[in-house]
Amino acid sequence: MSDTQKRIDDLVKSSEVLLFMKGTASFPQCGFSGRAIQILKACGVDPKAVVTVNVLEDDAIRQGIKEYSHWPTIPQLYVKGEFIGGSDIMMEMYESGELQQLLGTAE
């Protein structure tokens, strides 16, 4: 495992809710990353509880996360160490209520 893959693995395993995104939660740099943040907010997740990684600040992470997850696009959501998907999958799961259950925010 490369140093980059180890860094990613450590982040995934140590974070309850982790989002690899372009930009930051307060200033997303792409529409899909912004949508991912909005979905998490709509689920009732405290923004401070979400660990975000701005892949635009680290090219090794930006490329490495795609290899780590075998998923070609960003954003990427991980919950309790498990890869969930990108913003389209997040939206589908939100609409079905599955994402809220996974995050423990279901009413």
PLM regions and their residue ranges:
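N-terminal organelle transit peptides
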Residues: 1-4, 107
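TIR-domain catalytic/interaction hotspot
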Residues: 6, 62-64
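Local sequence-structure signature of Cys/Sec-based thiol-disulfide redox active-site neighborhoods
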Residues: 9-47
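Acidic beta-strand-to-loop metal/phosphate-binding motif
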Residues: 20, 76-80
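Thiol-based oxidoreductase modules, predominantly thioredoxin-like and allied folds used
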Residues: 45-62
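Thiol/disulfide oxidoreductase modules built on the thioredoxin-like
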Residues: 67-73
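Non-catalytic, surface beta->alpha helical segment in thiol-disulfide oxidoreductase systems
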Residues: 79-107
